[in-house]
């Protein structure tokens, strides 16, 4: 019987990418297949996030639930990876003795060896070292399902924002060699991938050697240009970027590379220069707005999303009002917004914070309601327009329909004959938007005369 692995992912797209790699590594080493049911698994892995306290505590809550599975199946292996593992290390085993494996984001490629050591010794294995970017040299070729894929181009972050734990859990910035990234993207294109999302904690800080050992360095703009030249790749996205790393070279790429989508996720974190300075973000609101102004001069239809922290220590009503003014001015399409969560070991955790929780919550609700109004307005503005979408697969709402994604990252559900589904999935097609919902759109196929009969048979 084929053994199975269950992976639960917390946090960002980097973690989603790493979770896929965990499955690939275990499939190559032991033939394990992925399952969505922990009860069916021989190995259960939690890929964790420590950006906010709530996500960290959720991990231990979930560990408590799978403890019963281990009691019923003693050979079941339980592992904790990701940023909580990197931060907590062996203390995870002390708190949850039934955990067998603890590994950091940089050591997931060592899972097969850790599993062997656990089985031979009977003792929990902990490896949370930072072996630079070694893991990419030991990962098997990606196995993908669907026309979209993530590609990690770098690890870590060297910005050391005062509130952020990432540099401590993932290390400083290290970029993959250019040829290594291009080889992975070309392999994905050969498997039918049409859209890639380039990933990094600070992705536009990419500075990769042209090839391993080479002294010649490629910047992020160069990487995008090369990826755009790979046959089969029709769309390029990236996340997460930093305003301080938005170079003129990167701005120029938006004018030269149409495959780079009209959508940008550029975290601002706050609208007050005073708070940005306390956060150690390294830019002012005016500098941030200057980047967006230049981008929108090149791409007038640019859709913009961001991250915003509410209730950072010392935030006043005036500071929050500046954030709201920026939200209105930028017309953000989406915002990942949260109440500030102090993380142990970060400088901001030592700042005095006398703002009542109720006031922070009120500010957050006001911010999120405003963003939702923006989302609704932008969705309504798309009614009647023809949008180019990449068809990703059956709709989650109705498997008899198909779903795709627009350049500005909107999901569009549309009817199509079942017989046409295999032909349409993975294709770039035109749809006319005829309904707007809070978090999705509905459309209908727009076909040239010669395509009409093929799509309906």
Swiss-Prot record:
Record-listed [4Fe-4S] cluster 1 binding positions: 12, 49, 83
InterPro entries from the UniProt entry: Elp3/MiaA/NifB-like_rSAM, Methylthiotransferase, Methylthiotransferase_CS, Methylthiotransferase_N, Methylthiotransferase_N_sf, MiaB_methiolase, rSAM, rSAM_horseshoe
Primary residence: cytoplasm
Domain TRAM as annotated: residue spans: 380-447
Subcellular location, record wording: Cytoplasm
Keywords, alphabetical: 4Fe-4S, Cytoplasm, Iron, Iron-sulfur, Metal-binding, S-adenosyl-L-methionine, Transferase, tRNA processing
Residue numbers binding [4Fe-4S] cluster 2: 157, 161, 164
Tagged with keyword S-adenosyl-L-methionine: yes
Single Gene Ontology MF annotation: N6-isopentenyladenosine methylthiotransferase activity
The enzyme's E.C. designation: 2.8.4.3
One GO term describing the cellular component: cytosol
Highest taxon of source: Bacteria
NCBIfam families: miaB-methiolase, MiaB/RimO family radical SAM methylthiotransferase
Described function: Catalyzes the methylthiolation of N6-(dimethylallyl)adenosine (i(6)A), leading to the formation of 2-methylthio-N6-(dimethylallyl)adenosine (ms(2)i(6)A) at position 37 in tRNAs that read codons beginning with uridine.
Family per record: Belongs to the methylthiotransferase family. MiaB subfamily.
Name the UniProt record assigns to this protein: tRNA-2-methylthio-N(6)-dimethylallyladenosine synthase
